[in-house]
Curated annotation (Swiss-Prot):
One term under GO cellular component: cytosolic small ribosomal subunit
Source organism of this protein record: Coxiella burnetii (strain RSA 493 / Nine Mile phase I)
NCBIfam families, alphabetized: S15_bact
GO molecular function: rRNA binding; structural constituent of ribosome
Keywords annotated in UniProt: Ribonucleoprotein, Ribosomal protein, RNA-binding, rRNA-binding
Phylogenetic classification of the source organism: Bacteria, Pseudomonadati, Pseudomonadota, Gammaproteobacteria, Legionellales
Spans traversing the lipid bilayer: none
Gene Ontology terms describing biological process: translation
Full protein name: Small ribosomal subunit protein uS15
Subunit structure as annotated in this protein's UniProt entry: Part of the 30S ribosomal subunit. Forms a bridge to the 50S subunit in the 70S ribosome, contacting the 23S rRNA.
Length: 89
């Protein structure tokens, strides 16, 4: 499940640190979170879709790695991001 480019652009605009920022950990985590939410809804309706389940687990793992990176390098940005996204630490 992918996001429409308009949805992605909206997320990038909301979480970017600078004018041309599209790759900061904040932006990447926000995009992954939106994809995870969308795929979680899909999985509720299609419980036996194991291929999508594998993709979901991969996205969750990637998000966790990015969050760990951010936590190691800038704790304040990490805390601000998980609060904005409503994630557990």
């Amino acid at each position: 499940m992918s996001l429409a480019s308009a949805e992605t652009a909206k997320i990038v605009k909301e979480y970017q640190l600078g004018k041309d920022d599209t790759g900061s950990p904040e932006v990447q985590v926000a995009i992954l979170t939106a994809k995870i939410i969308k795929l979680t809804d899909h999985m509720k309706a299609h419980k036996h879709d194991h291929h999508s389940r594998r993709g979901l687990l991969r996205m969750v793992s990637q998000r966790r790695k990015l969050l760990n990176f951010l936590k190691r390098n800038d704790l304040q940005r990490y805390l601000k991001l998980i609060e904005r996204l409503g994630l557990r630490s």
